[in-house]
Amino acid sequence: GIVFVLSIDKEQLCNSIRGHYGSDRINAEEYLRRFIDVEYLLPKPDIESYCKYLYEYFNFKEFLESDERYRNGLSGDKNNLLRCATEIIKAQNYSLRQIEKLFVHTRLVLCSCSSRHYVFPSLTFMLICIRTINPQYYQKIINQQLTLDELVNFIPTIFPVNIFNNKSSLSHTASLWGLAELFYCFAQSFLRTPQPLQLTNVDSSKPKLTFTIEYVDNEKLANAIIGCYRFYSDAGWGHIIKSIDLLNPILEQI
């Protein structure tokens, strides 16, 4: 005999059956049992493994792990990208298709960067998520149409705040580093305006933020922001924003 194996979204199929017959009263699941003898639910995917698979499949290695980037002290970009992506995706419960689209977009960004560019891997992934979920606010962020307090209040509407917190006192999450990159680059975009932003106060015994943010460890965030200023040497996000918006020429084939 012939055995048919069906891969379906049962909930959507039940909705389609009800729509076809024009009634919400139909027991669609019982109707399907006429045709389906055995059901098997696929296990939830291992997000960390899937992110690593997409990293290899779209050949991120060719760019992020190039000899020139390693010589320029950028060897941590791979780890930052994978850790941040994994933290966000686990918290957001994205579908596999959504995850793939995020990685494709991220790889396209890298294709328009040279090996000498700072690519802010954690921030880039976060900005692509913001652009996907709320494109209007994304435009406000990159066009300096928000105050710092408005940006602080907007972040929890996109990302679960637990991704920014680590119980360990010795380290921070990749997402917190991405948040620090966001505030750093946001401040850099105001650098040549009449109202430049100062994010930290280093005159005290411990670094302190000059703004109020309740959902992260303020000392860790202040230290991460100071780390951004030291590491990126006042570089901004101009090139990355153009690459995210697909306005820069492609320099590399995927």
Predicted regions and their residues:
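The feature marks long, low-complexity, polar/acidic/proline-rich intrinsically disordered regions embedded
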Residues: 47-48, 55, 63-254
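The catalytic "switch" region of P-loop NTPases
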Residues: 1-76
